[in-house]
Amino acid sequence: MPGYYLWTIGCQMNQAESDRLGRLFELWGYSLADKAEDAELVLVNSCVVREHAENKVVNRLHLLRSLKNKNPKLKIALTGCLVGQDISLIKKKFPFVDYIFGPGSMPDWREIPEGFILPLRPPVSANVTIMQGCNNFCTYCVVPYRRGREKSRSIAEIGCEVAELVRRGSREVVLLGQNVDSYGHDLPEKPCLADLLSALHDITGLLRIRFLTSHPKDISQKLIDAMAHLPKVCRSLSLPVQSGDDTILASMRRGYTNQQYRELVERIKTAMPDISLQTDLIVGFPSENEEQFNQSYKLMADIGYDAIHVAAYSPRPQTVAARDMADDVPVIEKKRRLKLIEDLQKETVGKANAALMDTFAEVLVEGLQKNKWQGRTLGGKLVFLESDLPLEGCLVKVKIFKTSPWSLQAKLVNILES
């Protein structure tokens, strides 16, 4: 049986698409290989959101070219955001790649029989893509140029996929999109994300629903109310701010101010005091000075996120920022600001997690990791526990006995649902 190998980098949407492609390969008679050297087909699912990620993809492709020189029968496939809209350019740059197709352009749910390419035994927490593309065109972001405009799947289609995943063993779904808060605006019925959450909430056997990524300007009160009143919807929200300074936010075309963002967070916390918030932040954006960076730092400190995904700005081809704005913050200064935010996150999250010592939590167990069961709380915190019982897929009550900024250690109290 021929083998295939998947190399994936980037967001959870990339991972979801790789999972789907892997299932297709298996239906075509391939088996998963342990490494690229043992495969007849290698798929690279790429990301170019950051320069560092793009460099990794290019390096991987050149390694595969060397492998192909040794084994001319090897077939290489490339997808993801490196491909973008103009495949001919990629073919010229990487002529040794055999198959090239854009992100999300593989056969999808609407073109194949129901459940045809879902895994026979899906993970406890399964990714489900609900929409592709983005209409926002933030000045630093290449995604709209690579994934195109927003295109939503219908509630009925998504519901069928989720129901089938649950039937096969999943207990949680993570709804994915570049901007899930604008879900449905392109559909005839004009449903919104809150409508989708309500529809999925009724699926028997589904224990939890998560979603990402959100855009602060598109979060409605209806969505906040749905999160607050639907028990299966996790108290976890990714709320990328990108900067805490109004001038930088305007340069980024984010569509909100520092104060508007703070007011949104206040509304969310009023509705859900136990909400876990995560954010994305860019440091060293063109023209960002020390005072402007301090506005971002203060916002991070004031809100107290459970996770801050911080990155140093790197210009991305095709974007307005790369074309019209000088990348004028020195690399050494970007690194300094990056470390300050990382240190703040470690301190903030460490204190928040320490406050959970000796408390109880409900954890959905996803699987084994280094001989310990691994799962997440309703707020998305990573928890490890030891038990000889078969806990995969179980919802359990635990007592936390050890904390760190990155995870919690807990003891099993009892099984709530198996």
Curated annotation (Swiss-Prot):
The keyword 4Fe-4S applies. Residues 120-351 form the Radical SAM core domain. Monomer. This is tRNA-2-methylthio-N(6)-dimethylallyladenosine synthase. Its EC number is 2.8.4.3. Residues 346-414 form the TRAM domain. It comes from Dehalococcoides mccartyi (strain CBDB1). Binds 2 [4Fe-4S] clusters. One cluster is coordinated with 3 cysteines and an exchangeable S-adenosyl-L-methionine.
